[in-house]
Amino acid sequence: MSFQVRIIAPNGIIWDSEAEEIILSTNTGKIGVLTNHTSLLTGLDIGTIRIRALNNQWNTLALMSGFAVIKDNVATIIVSEAENGANIKSEEAQTQLEEAKSYFNTAKGTKNEVEANLAVKRAETRLKASQNL
């Protein structure tokens, strides 16, 4: 049995297909969703979503925060930004992570430290998505 997964970002629908299972990063940790999951509204952290398609292949996308609504075998995920891991080059993601860590190590002041921390988190998420983790 399967359920519908829709990922929507400001630039359009990023994903819209049936899935057997998803694993996503909420503000309180990772959760798994299967068919007939109880209704749920949750905030999403910067992190990956793993989608097991009907052919048992796993797809990983980088999500940059938002929220998810699970109801009646439909998972609607609305995020500020999303990127399919298959479209992310691992080498570029690794370089971005190294640059973000360098920025984090030299950041001065609360605002810069918070921005640097978020940059590291985004870069780590993109790298994980590129590696289908």
Curated annotation (Swiss-Prot):
Keywords from the UniProt entry: ATP synthesis, CF(1), Chloroplast, Hydrogen ion transport, Ion transport, Membrane, Plastid, Thylakoid, Transport
GO CC, alphabetical: chloroplast thylakoid membrane; proton-transporting ATP synthase complex
Keyword Cytoplasm set for record: no
Annotated GO MF terms: ATP binding; proton-transporting ATP synthase activity, rotational mechanism
UniProt KW Phosphoprotein keyword: no
Pfam family, one: ATP-synt_DE_N
Subunit structure: F-type ATPases have 2 components, CF(1) - the catalytic core - and CF(0) - the membrane proton channel. CF(1) has five subunits: alpha(3), beta(3), gamma(1), delta(1), epsilon(1). CF(0) has three main subunits: a, b and c.
Protein name as annotated: ATP synthase epsilon chain, chloroplastic
